[in-house]
């Protein structure tokens, strides 16, 4: 997290760093954390999704990709819950005016859960229950901006194979293509400040663009 020690005079604001699976979000977050002490960086709670396991030792993340219609609602609830817990903790302990989060509850709601419902992998009842939960507890976080790493689904697929994260080996290309379209639709409709990064940008170039983007919120 950020290197400063004194708490800001007001509640920090949140900037969501988004992109397809395998876009390079985790790598960029790690580099940003080291290079930008004026920012706090909160990485995605993937560890929680991997440690939640059934009797056979299969993680919730693996189960979701193995049988998406069966586990979509369960996983999306888990994703928004674990992210909400981590984000609220970061806000309470925040020592910088801006917190960069690897994805956000908005991503959970407007990209992943919305896509699951539209594709029929969450029922109408499950969707309505999800929205009640989300609207009651998650929608009022101080998210002020979105950053998107624009990466082709094909490149994302290659990077997923390279990193070899357990549970992701079965992700099909059409799923990544659908996620890309869902992200594009969300960014087109949002009223929040946005920044798009190219997959061709170096890590240093991306960090500089993010630091400049975040200055408007200080």
Please place each PLM-identified region on the residue numbering:
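Conserved lysine of the Walker
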Residues: 25
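Conserved substrate/cofactor phosphate-moiety recognition/catalytic segment
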Residues: 34-76, 111
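Hydrophobic positions on the alpha1 helix immediately C-terminal to the Walker A/P-loop
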Residues: 28
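Hydrophobic anchor at the beta1->P-loop junction of P-loop NTPases
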Residues: 17
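Conserved nucleotide-sensing/catalytic segment adjacent to the nucleotide-binding pocket
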Residues: 56-98, 117-121
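A glycine- and Lys/Arg-enriched "phosphate-lid" helix/loop adjacent to the NTP-binding pocket
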Residues: 109-181
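P-loop (Walker A) phosphate-binding loop of NTP-binding proteins
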Residues: 20
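NTP-dependent small-molecule kinase module
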Residues: 2-4, 157-218
């Amino acid at each position: 997290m950020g290197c400063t020690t004194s708490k800001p005079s007001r509640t920090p604001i949140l900037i969501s760093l988004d992109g397809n699976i395998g876009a390079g979000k985790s790598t960029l977050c790690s580099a940003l954390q080291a290079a930008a002490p004026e920012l706090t960086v909160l990485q995605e709670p993937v560890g929680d999704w991997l440690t939640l396991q059934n009797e056979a030792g299969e993680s919730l993340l693996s189960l979701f990709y193995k049988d998406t219609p069966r586990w979509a609602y369960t996983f999306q609830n888990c994703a928004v819950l674990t992210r909400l817990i981590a984000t609220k903790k970061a806000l309470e302990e925040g020592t910088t005016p801006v917190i960069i989060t690897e994805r956000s509850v908005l991503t959970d709601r407007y990209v992943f859960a919305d896509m699951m419902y539209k594709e029929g992998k969450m029922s109408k009842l499950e969707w309505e229950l999800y929205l009640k939960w989300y609207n009651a507890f998650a929608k009022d976080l101080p998210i002020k901006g979105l950053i998107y790493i624009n990466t082709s689904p094909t490149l994302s697929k290659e990077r997923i194979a390279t990193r070899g994260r357990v549970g992701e080996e079965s992700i099909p290309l059409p799923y990544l293509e659908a996620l890309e379209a869902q992200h594009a639709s969300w960014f087109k409709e949002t009223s929040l400040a946005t920044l798009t990064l190219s997959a061709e940008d170096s890590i240093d170039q991306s960090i500089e663009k993010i630091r400049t983007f975040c200055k408007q919120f200080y």
